[in-house]
């Protein structure tokens, strides 16, 4: 329990001098013990020599003065874990921020842990049904897998994420952990009330480090959430871990890296980008005891998927759901691009031949339609062969049938949400591909659940 004193403050980075025979280790948590900011937690990042350590503040440093005394706790940041965290909102340090009293946890764990060893890990090919047609058809999720929702600003990552949580949390009765990393406070608030209204709040732990927080909070809050998820997994449960947004985690790392004086790499990102991403992603793993299924929203800067941040994230995922601005501009929601999205599970040996053939058939028709669009724009539909005209008609029906009303968007759209089973999804698209619905107007397929609903809608048109 050595004491040190603050010698330099540069924004969120604070240098502290300790006796040379008692210097804190990297990742040790330090606590300010006097002045206006008593209780502020700092995390050691570097040892500079001469007894001085460089730390990142887990809160605002406004009002911190040089000479303030700081105590070494002798351990890394410890957060509450276990059932006591369910239904609660916590910050990066595991402190409650929902004004509902103390957490009352029985156990605490360090946010810095090693990933499961090679022997402990296990893989699964069991599918996780989401009830969202386009995802179940084209990029199915695996239980215990990692999924990324990629998209630029305002194409619906958070709404898709909330719908997935609602569907999976209600249909799958396990526990979930939600880490809000550098997102809007309003969305965090909406999310809390959405979970409360759906009666699934008692199965979700919420950890928030919002946009207005210092970079230290946003960098560590994903690890706090992950630690809680790991505890549920180690108890033998199948847990869902949601992160919104992984890009803000990278961005916080960039801010911290610049403050620590590291030389930036490509596009101004931190030189340790791949390592920081790896440290987080490798811990999100399923073991022989239990599984973590992770769904992560990934903001794509300027809609450029080759940007180093989304590109680094791609390498760790089993399924990628790419949201497209072009599809959103057509009014088709969820705006998932069925040609850009992919999944490792899309294999006939995993999902079965019928599902595989239907998914590939849908992609083939949409790809051909994409190629014909230029010809249609220049020469018009009349110049196409009869075969191509039929293909375009089916493609437009498929495109509209890939849309569906969401439960979490009911307040905005006025349409009641739909959960579509995988069996209904496959039979619907198979029917369109086989020409069973060629006589129906394409508008009948827009914003419906199953194909039976489209048939009902067509009767009234």
UniProtKB/Swiss-Prot annotation:
User: What cellular-component terms does GO give this entry?
Assistant: plasma membrane; proton-transporting ATP synthase complex
Principal location class: membrane
From the UniProt record, which GO molecular function terms apply? ATP binding; ATP hydrolysis activity; proton-transporting ATP synthase activity, rotational mechanism
State the superkingdom.
Answer: Bacteria
Q: How does it sit in the membrane?
A: Peripheral membrane protein
User: InterPro entries annotated for this entry?
Assistant: AAA+_ATPase (IPR003593), ATP-synt_VA_C (IPR055190), ATP_synth_F1_bsu (IPR005722), ATPase_a/bsu_AS (IPR020003), ATPase_alpha/beta_chains (IPR050053), ATPase_F1/V1/A1_a/bsu_N (IPR004100), ATPase_F1/V1/A1_a/bsu_N_sf (IPR036121), ATPase_F1/V1/A1_a/bsu_nucl-bd (IPR000194)
Q: Where in the cell is it found?
A: Cell inner membrane
Presence of the UniProt keyword Membrane in the record: yes
* Function recorded in the entry: Produces ATP from ADP in the presence of a proton gradient across the membrane. The catalytic sites are hosted primarily by the beta subunits.
Q: Name the family.
A: Belongs to the ATPase alpha/beta chains family.
User: How is the quaternary structure described?
Assistant: F-type ATPases have 2 components, CF(1) - the catalytic core - and CF(0) - the membrane proton channel. CF(1) has five subunits: alpha(3), beta(3), gamma(1), delta(1), epsilon(1). CF(0) has three main subunits: a(1), b(2) and c(9-12). The alpha and beta chains form an alternating ring which encloses part of the gamma chain. CF(1) is attached to CF(0) by a central stalk formed by the gamma and epsilon chains, while a peripheral stalk is formed by the delta and b chains.
Q: Known HAMAP family for this protein?
A: ATP_synth_beta_bact (MF_01347)
Q: What is this protein called?
A: ATP synthase subunit beta
Natural source organism:
Pseudoalteromonas translucida (strain TAC 125)
Q: What is the lineage of its organism?
A: Bacteria, Pseudomonadati, Pseudomonadota, Gammaproteobacteria, Alteromonadales
Q: Which gene encodes it?
A: atpD
